Curated annotation (Swiss-Prot):
Residue span, ATP-cone domain: 49-139
Cofactor details (free text): Binds 1 zinc ion.
GO molecular function terms listed in the Swiss-Prot or TrEMBL record: ATP binding; DNA binding; zinc ion binding
Source organism (scientific name): Polaromonas naphthalenivorans (strain CJ2)
TM helices/strands, residue ranges: none
HAMAP family for this protein: NrdR (MF_00440)
Protein name in UniProt: Transcriptional repressor NrdR
Lineage, opening ranks: Bacteria, Pseudomonadati, Pseudomonadota, Betaproteobacteria, Burkholderiales
C-alpha cells in the first residue's frame, strides 16, 4: 500500500485488530522508507443500491454524504463520533436489507431521520427542517410538537 506521507509503495502491517462488531479490520502500517505509521480500515465490498433523486437522476450511494449531513445536524450536540458511525452502519444495513437495486433519495432521508431521532431530538429537528423544506412555521411547530411528546 502506498504511504500517504512520502508515496513509497512498500509498507508493512505492524498491527491488526478486528472491530468489536466484526464489521471491519483496522490495520496499523509502517512505511519502509520514511518509517511513519498510519491506519487503514478494511470492510467488505458490498454493492449499495443507486440513489434516485427527485428529478430522476441516479447517483451512487455515498457514505460521506450521509456522515456529513448527520455531523452537521449533530454539531455541538452531545453525541460521539462512534455513535454517529454506528447510526450510519444501521442505515447501511437497512439499505442493503431492502434488496433493491435503486432506492429513492426520500427513502434514504427517512432512514437518516429515523436514526437521528434515536440519537438526538434536536439534531432530528435540525435535519428534518431542511430535508422536508417546510413552507411555513406551522409545519415546523407540528414537527416540534410531535418530537416533544
Amino acid at each position: 500500500m502506498k504511504c500517504p506521507f512520502c508515496g513509497h509503495l512498500e509498507t508493512q502491517v505492524v498491527e491488526t485488530r478486528i472491530s468489536e462488531d466484526a464489521e471491519f479490520i483496522r490495520r496499523r502500517r509502517q512505511c519502509g522508507a520514511c518509517e511513519k505509521r498510519f491506519t487503514t480500515y478494511e470492510r467488505p465490498d458490498v454493492s449499495f443500491p443507486s440513489i434516485v433523486k427527485k428529478d430522476g437522476r441516479r447517483t451512487d450511494y455515498q457514505r460521506g454524504k450521509i456522515l456529513g449531513s448527520m455531523r452537521l445536524a449533530l454539531r455541538k450536540r452531545p453525541v460521539s463520533t462512534a455513535q454517529i458511525d454506528a447510526a450510519v452502519e444501521q442505515i447501511e444495513e437497512k439499505l442493503l436489507s431492502l434488496g433493491l437495486r435503486e432506492v429513492a433519495s426520500s427513502r434514504l432521508g427517512e432512514l437518516v431521520m429515523l436514526e437521528l431521532k434515536k440519537l438526538d431530538k434536536i439534531a432530528y429537528i435540525r435535519f428534518a427542517s431542511v430535508y422536508r423544506s417546510f413552507e411555513d412555521i406551522d409545519e415546523f411547530k407540528t414537527l416540534v410538537d410531535e418530537v416533544g411528546r
